[in-house]
Amino acid sequence: MEEVRDCRLEEGLSVEGLVECYRDIHGFMAGHLAEAVEVLREGLEASSVRVLTFTGNLVATGLRGVLAQLIDGGLFNVVFTTAGALDHDIARFMGGKYLKGRFEADDTELHRRGVHRLGNVFIPVESYGPLVERFVRTLAEQAAGVRGEWGVYELLRLAGSLMEGDRDSILAAAARRGVDVFVPGWPDGAFGTSLFMERQRGTSITVDYFRDMARLADIFFPQEGEAAALIVGGGISKHHAIWWSQFRGGLDYAVYVTTAVEYDGSLSGAHPREAVSWGKIKESSRRVVVYGDATITLPVIAYCLLHGCG
């Protein structure tokens, strides 16, 4: 066993130096974060299937640009996320103003003023729903002009092409890099509701998620090579990633970044070792959990993946 070493913070300390400091500190999540960087660097280099999952709330923060950069950097070739991520990515592309607020704000007063609150981010009503609706109308009309039936991932590829020019857009980055974005809960937000309303208005478009599942089968059923995943947060995007991974024998590398705990039996809090029992992560895998707010931990991890640490 290595000894715990004391860390000294010298002037001009780099991110690489900070991660080395975390490795020396070791207790308690510092060592986990340093190990996560090691696992991901090894896994992303070795794997043919490289998965990134994240929850929609993060896209309402400035972490949106970091997530887009991870995709644009070619580190991942499969993305799983939630309907909220689509809404926030589109709304911000359309000029929506997301404001720095406070957790302890008066929500009744915010409602009366037409402001949504997402944690300590304030979203004026006009910066959200109406912008997504306007974008989806254009998207649906363009899609219907090509063909009648679409998978969700195919629509999102088209959406990303319409968002080209926004370097911080997740969908635009995915479209540029040819990365498929899968959103199993796609109806559960403004994007899905707006598509439904366009269908009700008479736009000739049908969404068939079985097309997405066929594409996922193409990705995950082949047994060649290895698979790695960076899973940020929990919920449906986390589960869809590990669910499909079981069909190739499980993930070879897995890093979870979460604030959820396993003691309530929730999917979001479930530890990688629990996924081993389901065959979703391999017994022989390299795996680590980093407990902490992703808006703090992920930028450090992402920097090391993009620019190198250690």
Swiss-Prot record:
Catalytic activity field: [eIF5A protein]-L-lysine + spermidine = [eIF5A protein]-deoxyhypusine + propane-1,3-diamine
Pfam families noted in UniProt: DS (PF01916)
GO molecular function: deoxyhypusine synthase activity
EC code(s) of this entry: 2.5.1.46
GO cellular component terms, semicolon-separated: cytoplasm
Classification via SUPFAM superfamilies: DHS-like NAD/FAD-binding domain (SSF52467)
Catalytic residue positions: 280 (nucleophile)
Swiss-Prot/TrEMBL keywords: Hypusine biosynthesis, NAD, Transferase
Broad enzyme group: transferase
Protein name (record): Probable deoxyhypusine synthase
Gene source species: Aeropyrum pernix (strain ATCC 700893 / DSM 11879 / JCM 9820 / NBRC 100138 / K1)
Lineage of source species: Archaea, Thermoproteota, Thermoprotei, Desulfurococcales, Desulfurococcaceae
Gene that this polypeptide is encoded by: dys
